[in-house]
Amino acid sequence: HQPDVVLATPLADCGPYQTDYTKSAQRLGLPVGFVPFSWDNLTNRGLIRIAPDRVLVWNEHQKREAVTFHGVPEDRVVVAGAARFEDFFAMQPSASRADFCARAGLDPSRPILLYLCSSNFVAPDEVSFVRRWMCAIRTAADPALAPSGIIVRPHPAHPEPWHGVDLGRVENTTIWSDEAKIQADPGLYDSLYHSAAVVGLNTSAMIEAGILGKP
């Protein structure tokens, strides 16, 4: 292989292997670009140990983070947008509301609330929290809110806490997701598209919710 350029992501991580790629590429005279995969890659994962030739950040906030926290020369940092979400912007729902609700086991006549679960690092005991939240929804004084359908979508990297959890005593609820994909996930898109509102603690899927204009 004789590449023209090497692109690395997430690079600013806990492990060193992508730093080795950067060192090797630069030794061979190949330009190296770094594309942050997620919004928090420059603030809570690790350091950029060797500055790439270009850092293609999402926005001015990430540009400041790259320069301030990682010491990347400002002239190497380019605001290029969030490449990860390009495909998501172009997506369309794969199912009608009736078909989606039939798959998820929900009443299509009711509005849907989507709960997006977080990683174990953020929410180590999310099951008990979600149960309390669902109880608050069902006992709400608002007659439109209380009977809403509820989808609990486990975090794709941390589904284990929801294995075997039974929400059967709470009507019109489901723990549901299609086979998860890292990006351009059609199951996530459909869940967001057909929901009236989205709830979560701290997960990148809130960005996808914002793309679809969901409160």
Where in this protein do the model-derived segments appear?
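Conserved catalytic-core segment of nucleotide-activated headgroup transferases in glycan assembly
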Residues: F85-D178
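Structural motif
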Residues: D4-V5, R54, I112, G149, ...
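Donor nucleotide-activated moiety binding/catalytic core segment of transferases
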Residues: A157-I207, I211-L212
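Active-site and donor-binding regions of nucleotide-sugar-utilizing enzymes
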Residues: H1-S94, H158-P159, Q183, M206
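Hydrophobic anchor at the start of a short beta-strand
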Residues: V32-G33, I150, K214-P215
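Redox-cofactor binding/interface segments in oxidoreductases and associated redox assembly factors
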Residues: A8, V57, Y115, V152, ...
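Short amphipathic alpha-helical segments and helix-helix/interface helices
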Residues: T19-T22, R45, V130, M134-R138, ...
